[in-house]
Amino acid sequence: MARYLGPKLKLSRREGTDLFLKSGVRAIDTKCKIDNAPGVHGARRGRLSEYGVQLREKQKVRRMYGVLEKQFRNYYKEAARLKGNTGENLLQLLEGRLDNVVYRMGFGATRAEARQLVSHKAILVNGKVVNVPSFKVAANDVVSIREKAKQQARIKAALEVAEQREKPTWIEVDGGKMEGTFKRMPERSDLSADINEQLIVELYSK
């Protein structure tokens, strides 16, 4: 499946929630009727079946983290093999992706921008260039901006935006040095309450 390259707000309207695909503290302004489905007049949302609700939740989380369908299913399979709660394991695997960590640290204004930074070899992990967005970041790994990329205006702008966001407790960032430490995997209570991971587990368990 190809990566979606269309309007980002259209995806958020489809899911009925802010997927944080646009830069800024509040990604969607009041002019975007997020509660309306895509379309000129915003089609009415019909009552979804149980399967439909589960599918929408999966699509919402998949799009939020910018992961393709096959990748997402593989993350679920890995989460199911791990000890503990499968849904929480899934969210931790997604949070541990390098592109997501770069976003959480504020080096990219969006996950898509963070993914570009990784792909363009602007990111170091423990002093070594890593250009794989899905790279698994481990506890105490140090993620930083490569020296020759530190003057990029978009990185500086992203750090300014990040100053206005709530700072993740599982990450420590030095904006001046443009580096951060992934202290630990986030607990479920650290993450968005707007995600119902149990619906995804139920979907894939069928």
UniProtKB/Swiss-Prot annotation:
Q: Which organism is it from?
A: Vibrio campbellii (strain ATCC BAA-1116)
Gene3D superfamilies documented for this protein = Ribosomal Protein S4 Delta 41, Chain A, domain 1, RNA-binding S4 domain
Which keywords belong to this entry? Ribonucleoprotein, Ribosomal protein, RNA-binding, rRNA-binding
Q: Name one Pfam family in it.
A: S4
Task: Please state which protein family the record places this protein in.
Answer: Belongs to the universal ribosomal protein uS4 family.
Q: Give GO terms: molecular function aspect only.
A: rRNA binding; structural constituent of ribosome
Assembly behavior: Part of the 30S ribosomal subunit. Contacts protein S5. The interaction surface between S4 and S5 is involved in control of translational fidelity.
Q: Which residues form the S4 RNA-binding domain?
A: 96-156
- Top-level taxon of origin: Bacteria
Q: This chain belongs to which protein, by name?
A: Small ribosomal subunit protein uS4
Which HAMAP family does the entry link to? Answer: Ribosomal_uS4_B
What this protein is reported to do is described as: One of the primary rRNA binding proteins, it binds directly to 16S rRNA where it nucleates assembly of the body of the 30S subunit. With S5 and S12 plays an important role in translational accuracy.
Q: Which InterPro entries match?
A: Ribosomal_uS4, Ribosomal_uS4_bac-type, Ribosomal_uS4_CS, Ribosomal_uS4_N, S4_RNA-bd, S4_RNA-bd_sf
Q: Name one GO biological process term.
A: ribosomal small subunit biogenesis
- Which Gene Ontology cellular component annotation is one that this UniProt entry carries? small ribosomal subunit
The protein's matches in CDD domains, at most eight in alphabetical order, are given as: S4 (cd00165)
